[in-house]
Amino acid sequence: MDFYQEYITTIHDFCIDKEQLVKRIEGLKVSRPASLIIPILYKEVENPPLKKIITDLNECTYLSQVVIALAAETTEQYVHVVEYFKDLKLPHIVVWCDGPRIKQIIFDMKKKGIDLTSFKGKGKDVWIATGIATLESYAIAYHDADIVTYSVDLPAKLLYPIVETELNFFFNKGYYARINLDSMTMHGRVFRLFVRPLLDTLQSESNADILRYFLAFRYTLAGEFAMTSDLAMNIRIPADWGLEVGLLAEVYRNATTKKICQIDLGYYDHKHQELGVNRSEGLCKMVSDIFTTFMRVVTESTDNRISESYLHGIHVRYKRLGQDLIRRYHADALCNGLYYNRHEEEIYVDMFARVIRKAGDDYRHDPSDVLMPDWTRALSAVPDLREKLYEACIADVKEYCEKK
């Protein structure tokens, strides 16, 4: 436990009164309504964490709406998810992001000069759900559907700094300890062994303010965050695994750091991914996308040129810092009685280092981005786009789910 303040405001959980947080958000429900967006893959419906999340959300009566951004391939899958979420008693809507109606809307946008047809995945789904949520929300919280350690106060912690009139933050990101107390293991390898040493490496090459900003976040890759609808309308959302990093870069460009904060969410665990044997799968795919996003940040925000020699230096320094961190985490784990496999951690650092070289070379040859357009631009082309998406969701329910 500490009370250190980073470059951005850090809200610690010394003794947060969760009941008071909920009461205050409830009191602001009319003037500052809050929504929650949950991106979900169809296969996650069968995972135990989602059932508990729904049970806990039923106690979050301060939420005006829950928007489920669903990736499903068939009508049967869509109907199954709609039926599954009937246990959620809060006002909610299931957005079938791959459904024929929304696909047609996306295709029609191409005629207006906004081509989203090549985008797919979580980023696109979050973008669609954000448009719908901003119709009636002052603030929007986001979190995934696989949180094992979910609790009723998680959305409240994310939303309170945004809706509280004495604070008025524009953006709030969660941070936590990725520790499983049942198995006594330390997780979060992509952040611990890749993102943090990479940021330290990049900062040593260029003392840019945006890198200082990134280093201030205690868990850069946290998928739990909240923001005002106004900010959500003005940021470009990345469409790949660089979502969390790219989003932070967009927030930096659109909001003063005085209005950005992070909050302690305690212990956290979720479904884990395998390392993968190449850059197209598992954690290696994630690391590749994240590294590419950071290279784009360096290109846009510093004087550094992404050359072969620059990438070689990054590769060497990253690997050294990663190996140094393994020794530190081993000491931390040993003192806390946590299981820690140093050999396995070394394997991860070696693999991540190889990804840096390959992803860096790819970026040099093709530095194009994978950012969705911001909603402000989309509405300038199609003013009623949000309403069209909402109406498509309602029509999907009527056609596929209501008994004839």
Swiss-Prot record:
How is the co-factor bound, per the entry? Requires divalent cations for activity in the following order of efficiency: Mn(2+), Co(2+) and Mg(2+) ions.
Q: Which reaction does it catalyse?
A: an NDP-alpha-D-glucose + (2R)-3-phosphoglycerate = (2R)-2-O-(alpha-D-glucopyranosyl)-3-phospho-glycerate + a ribonucleoside 5'-diphosphate + H(+)
Q: Give the protein's biological function.
A: Involved in the biosynthesis of 6-O-methylglucose lipopolysaccarides (MGLPs). Catalyzes the transfer of a glucose (Glc) moiety from uridine diphosphate (UDP-Glc) to the position 2 of 3-phospho-D-glycerate (3-PGA) to form glucosyl-3-phosphoglycerate (GPG).
Gene name as annotated:
gpgS
Tell me the protein family, please: Belongs to the glycosyltransferase 2 family.
**Enzyme class, one word?**
transferase
GO molecular function (one): glycosyltransferase activity
How do changes in temperature affect this protein's function? Optimum temperature is 50 degrees Celsius.
Record-listed a divalent metal cation binding positions: 146, 270
Where does this protein hold (2R)-3-phosphoglycerate?
188-190
Which Enzyme Commission numbers does its entry carry? 2.4.1.266
Which UniProt keywords are present, listed alphabetically?
Cobalt, Glycosyltransferase, Magnesium, Manganese, Metal-binding, Nickel, Transferase
Q: What is this protein called?
A: Glucosyl-3-phosphoglycerate synthase
Keyword Magnesium set for record: yes
Name its co-factor(s). Mn(2+); Co(2+); Mg(2+)
pH-related activity info reads:
Optimum pH is 7.5-8.5.
Query: What is the residue range of the signal peptide feature?
Result: none
